[in-house]
Regions:
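A short, surface-exposed helix-loop junction/capping segment
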Residues: 1, 41-45, 114, 118-124
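Active-site and donor-binding regions of nucleotide-sugar-utilizing enzymes
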Residues: 1-61, 180-183, 190-193, 198-199
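A general structural motif
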Residues: 2, 104-106, 148
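Short, charged/polar "capping" segments at the starts of alpha-helices
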Residues: 4, 10-15, 119-120, 157-164
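Short beta-strand segments
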Residues: 5-7, 112-113, 152-155
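A nucleotide-sugar donor-handling region in carbohydrate enzymes
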Residues: 48-115
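Short, flexible/disordered intra-domain loops and linkers
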Residues: 48-56, 118-133
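Donor-binding and catalytic core of enzymes assembling or modifying cell-surface/extracellular glycoconjugates
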Residues: 124-199
């Protein structure tokens, strides 16, 4: 079959995937309309609008499968894979070793408290879509978890800056690359997040 994936962002997540890498195109590729889009039937999957997904009755991968392949039988889906390179894996191992040396615990948890729609508004973190953990809840969570676990805060710089006064428990690395974050999440023991980026 001749098919392609056109993605508005995060196309680097597909790098290294033997099935998807050569079929994935960023929206800003010159000539994309003429070479790929013009003669194609377009399927615009939006898994977040699937009842089963937002009621936690199917995974994100199953929601995509339902929309793209028009099926409720997901038995043929394998485990999702991210193909990381050695440098990404080594970078994650080094980051975790640094966190473990500072926080001195055996188990590491990455916490992503704020979703994509969160923003800073006059010193407060707000999320109009209500998909983020409220800051006061996040502070209680990391305070409690930090008694037994190493904590890594996953979030953009403006959020790290806003939480640093109340959250002295977590490491707050500023990593703009989502593949590096994927490697850190994969190398960690647990992940707590409210946004599909981390999931």
């Amino acid at each position: 079959e001749d098919w392609a994936i056109i993605i508005g962002g995060w196309d680097t997540l597909f790098f290294g995937n033997p099935l998807l890498q050569d079929r994935t195109f960023s929206m800003d590729v010159k000539g994309l309309f003429e070479t790929v889009i013009k003669d194609s039937e377009i399927v615009h999957p939006e898994p977040y609008t699937q009842w089963e997904y937002y009621n936690q009755q199917c995974s994100l991968a199953e929601a995509f499968d339902k929309v793209i392949n028009q099926t409720d039988d997901h038995s043929d889906l394998g485990k999702p894979n991210m193909y990381l390179c050695k440098a990404e894996e080594k970078g994650a191992a080094n980051a975790l070793a640094s966190v473990k040396a500072k926080q001195n615990k055996d188990i590491t948890i990455v916490v992503q408290p704020f979703g994509r729609s969160a923003r800073v508004d006059n010193g407060d973190i707000v999320d109009d879509s209500s998909r983020s953990i409220e800051p006061h809840v996040y502070y209680k969570l990391v305070k409690k978890l930090s008694q037994k676990y190493n904590i890594i805060f996953m979030g953009e710089g403006e959020f790290a800056k806003e939480v640093e006064e109340e959250d002295s428990y977590s490491e707050k690395p500023q990593i703009p690359d989502i593949r590096a974050w994927a490697a850190i999440i994969e190398a960690s023991d647990y992940f707590i997040g409210c946004d599909s980026m981390g999931q």
